[in-house]
């Protein structure tokens, strides 16, 4: 298992990469780091499977970054929707 920390905007994600069920496949588990100084992890976890070469660090990094980008985009979208809904409720 390999562990990487990737930053996107003002968020940090801890990614654990483990061998998948098939050759050349890896499971990437992403945990958002809420307080980087204390390494407190958000309990919400995204399991993600990506075909990457586990022997090549650049391939692992590229695969993990694409998983984080996808997850980060979803979280950012959710946050925007929550903010818009809150503003709408305050106006009505």
Over which residues does each language-model region extend?
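Mixed-charge, Lys/Arg-enriched low-complexity segments
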Residues: 37-92
């Amino acid at each position: 298992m390999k562990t990487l920390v990737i930053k996107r905007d003002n968020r940090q994600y801890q990614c654990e990469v483990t061998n998948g069920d098939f050759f050349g496949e890896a499971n990437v588990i992403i945990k958002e780091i809420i307080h980087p100084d204390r390494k407190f992890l958000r309990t919400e976890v995204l399991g993600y499977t990506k075909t990457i070469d586990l022997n090549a660090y650049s391939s692992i990094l590229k695969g993990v970054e694409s998983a984080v980008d996808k997850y980060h985009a979803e979280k950012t979208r959710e946050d925007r929707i929550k903010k818009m809904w809150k503003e709408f409720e305050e106006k009505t």
